[in-house]
């Protein structure tokens, strides 16, 4: 018999096989008054064979209501803390993403400005070379001592020209 089940009224001490009247006690149902005066030895002998039927004499200890409430309260607090932490994590991630997006846009603008500046400097260089080449025939300085940018072996200028 499982705890919480109602005992079968058809099962009595006299109907159990091999038990018969238990150690001198009558097979009829015992009253509280009769149990008070019964010999403890006889009572123990009567109760012991009933263990195979899973008869539970005591109540199973149930958790106290306040313990259940405390456990539920702890769960609620833990869930609330987790919810707050998750929101904080999402906000930090969102802020980080927005920061990286702004930084990316700023760097792209800077890159575009630098490319524009490179193009302007290339054009200015070409104009200066052209002016120098136009001026050379009229210049009285010896051409042996002056090197023009075309004849110089400047690796930086060569790299810029290749681009």
Curated annotation (Swiss-Prot):
Modification after translation: Phosphorylation of Thr-148 by MAPK8 in response to different stress conditions such as, UV irradiation, oxidatives stress and anisomycin treatments.
Region spans: Basic motif: 74-96
Pfam families reported for this sequence: bZIP_1 (PF00170)
Modified residues (Phosphothreonine): 148
Cross-link (Glycyl lysine isopeptide (Lys-Gly) (interchain with G-Cter in SUMO2)): 65
Ranges for region Disordered: 1-20, 58-89
GO MF entries: cAMP response element binding; chromatin binding; DNA-binding transcription factor activity, RNA polymerase II-specific; DNA-binding transcription repressor activity, RNA polymerase II-specific; histone chaperone activity; histone deacetylase binding; leucine zipper domain binding; protein heterodimerization activity
Entry keyword annotation includes Glycosyltransferase: no
Family matches, as Gene3D superfamilies: 1.20.5.170
Alphabetical GO biological process terms: chromatin remodeling; fat cell differentiation; negative regulation of fat cell differentiation; negative regulation of transcription by RNA polymerase II; regulation of transcription by RNA polymerase II
bZIP domain: residues covered: 72-135
Annotated keywords: DNA-binding, Isopeptide bond, Nucleus, Phosphoprotein, Repressor, Transcription, Transcription regulation, Ubl conjugation
Region named Leucine-zipper: 100-128
Tree of life domain: Eukaryota
Subcellular location: Nucleus
The UniProt record lists the keyword Nucleus: yes
GO cellular component: chromatin; nucleus; RNA polymerase II transcription regulator complex
InterPro entries found in the cross-reference section: AP-1 (IPR000837), bZIP (IPR004827), bZIP_sf (IPR046347)
Entry similarity comment: Belongs to the bZIP family. ATF subfamily.
Assembly and interaction partners: Forms a homodimer or heterodimer with JUN, JUNB, JUND, CEBPG and ATF2 thereby inhibiting transactivation by JUN, ATF2 and CEBPG. Binds multiple DNA elements such as cAMP-response element (CRE) and TPA response element (TRE) either as homodimer or heterodimer. Interacts with IRF2BP1.
Function: Component of the AP-1 transcription factor that represses transactivation mediated by the Jun family of proteins. Involved in a variety of transcriptional responses associated with AP-1 such as UV-induced apoptosis, cell differentiation, tumorigenesis and antitumogeneris. Can also function as a repressor by recruiting histone deacetylase 3/HDAC3 to the promoter region of JUN. May control transcription via direct regulation of the modification of histones and the assembly of chromatin.
Name of the protein: Jun dimerization protein 2
């Amino acid at each position: 018999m499982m705890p919480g089940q109602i005992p079968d009224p058809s099962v009595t001490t006299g109907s159990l096989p091999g038990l018969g009247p238990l150690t001198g006690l009558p097979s009829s149902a015992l009253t509280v008054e009769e149990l008070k005066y019964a010999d403890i030895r006889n009572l123990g002998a009567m109760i012991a064979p009933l263990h195979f039927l899973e008869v539970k004499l005591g109540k199973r200890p149930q958790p106290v209501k306040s313990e259940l409430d405390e456990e539920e309260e702890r769960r609620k607090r833990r869930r609330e803390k987790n919810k707050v932490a998750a929101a904080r994590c999402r906000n930090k991630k969102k802020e980080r993403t927005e920061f990286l997006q702004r930084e990316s846009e700023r760097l792209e603008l800077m890159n575009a400005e630098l490319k524009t500046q490179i193009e302007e400097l290339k054009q200015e260089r070409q104009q200066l070379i052209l002016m120098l080449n136009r001026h050379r025939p009229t210049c009285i300085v010896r051409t042996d001592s002056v090197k023009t940018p075309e004849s110089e072996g400047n690796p930086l200028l060569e790299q810029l020209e290749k681009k």
